[in-house]
C-alpha cells in the first residue's frame, strides 16, 4: 500500500466523556465492539447491526461497577468475560451475558490498565501505585509486583499487554520511561527498553556503571504486540514511537509524531500501525517505514484527542476525548 486515505464513516454515539478503552471480539459470526469511558460506563456494540438509529448498534450497557472513571478494559477471546479498571482503585471481572461482576482488589490508587492473556486464564492490572497485580479469572490475587521486586518500574504503570501466543509473557510500560518484558510464571524480568534502546544490565554490571533506565520525559503511554508477538510497538508522551524486535532486542523502526502518542493498534489486513495522538490519527506502514495516511482531528473540533484504537479489518475505530467513537476506513489512494 504505497499511499492511502482515511474516510470517516458513521459515528458511534453513546458515551458522554472520554473513550479510554476499545476492544473488538468475534463471536458466533458477530463482531462486537466494547468501549469504556470516563463517564463510568461500558457499551457493547454490534458493528454490523442494520438498525438505523443513534443507539441502534448498542447491545448492552454495563454501569454501576465503578464510582469513578473507567480507564481501560479487555475482553476474553470467547467474549464471555470482560475486565474493567478505574480511578476508584478497583477492577471488575464481568460476565458479559448476565452483567454480573466480581471485584478485583489490591491496588492502593487509580488502576490505569488491564490485559487478559492468550488463553484467558491470567489478568494483569497496572496502577498509579507503581504496582502490577496478577489475578486468576475467579478474582483471586495471585501475585503482586511492587517496589520490592527486582527490576520493577519506578513510575506509574500506564499500559500492560500480554504476548499474543505465550500465555505467561507480559509487556509493561511506565511513566519512568521504560518498557519491560516479564515471564509471570517464573516471575522473571526478561528485557528493558528506554527510548527504543535495549538496557543491558549485565554489560553495565561488568563495566561497574549504572545503567540508564529512568527518564520521565519518555513516559510510555501505549503499546501493542504484532500478531505473532515478534515485534512490540510502543509510544511515548514525547511523541516518539518505536518498533522493537523482541528476539534480537533491537529497535527496527521509529517515528516522531511530535505530540503525545495516546493509543496504538496493529493492522489486521495490512502491514500498518495506527497511532492516536493529541492532534491526529496516523497510519504508519511497516514495509516502507513511513506515514501513508493521517486524519487531522481538528476537523472534528479543537482539542480533540484520540485515546483508544481498535482495528476491524480495514476499518479503524477511534475512541475520542469527546466521547464519540469514529470509524475510519483505510483505503488505497489512486
Curated annotation (Swiss-Prot):
The lineage of its organism: Eukaryota, Fungi, Fungi incertae sedis, Microsporidia, Unikaryonidae. It comes from Encephalitozoon cuniculi (strain GB-M1). Gene3D superfamilies: YVTN repeat-like/Quinoprotein amine dehydrogenase (2.130.10.10). SUPFAM superfamilies: WD40 repeat-like. This is Guanine nucleotide-binding protein subunit beta-like protein. CDD domains: WD40 (cd00200). WD repeats lie at residues 14-55, 65-104, 106-145, 152-192, 215-256, 257-294. Keywords: Repeat, WD repeat. PROSITE patterns: WD_REPEATS_1, WD_REPEATS_2, WD_REPEATS_REGION. The keyword Repeat applies. Belongs to the WD repeat G protein beta family. It comes from the Eukaryota.
